[in-house]
Amino acid sequence: MNGKAQVTMYETAEAKKYKKDFTKYIKEQVKIQQFNIIPNKTQHFYCDCVFYFDRIDKDANNYFKLLLDSITDSQCVWLDDNVVCERVNAIYYDSKNPRIEINIYPVDYIGIFQSQEQLSNFTNNCIHCNRYKEGKCSILNKAKEGRILEEIENGKCIKFKCLKEIQN
């Protein structure tokens, strides 16, 4: 073990069945609700949940993780649950009708940009920079991934160098 703790995840048979059934249900609901999103690595989502458990001793965190894993396994909404902003809005107890109510919707922000408009304005400026070659500016790409960069101050790239053809 090299002096490091080893953790083994264990999924009960009940959890495996829940995950499999829920993955199938997600795929069905995506079609029924016409949730037309092409999964990608940068789009983030809010996942708002209200749990109605049949008894008090249930753990919302475990169910939420299984829920996220099931949605990830479906590959219909997102590719990896690292793009999810998780929000458990309430936990109730309803022995007659246990359920989970889920609302999934895309966030407005894109990376460090608060809106599509802010991203477009930044990108339009980038197009006129020496660093922007066929859309491959590392600063812009990292900013779209949500990385905080020293090169961007107050919404402006401090590494901006105007293309020679525009300067003339």
Task: Report residues per predicted region.
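Acidic, proline/glycine-enriched N-terminal capping motif
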Residues: M1-N168
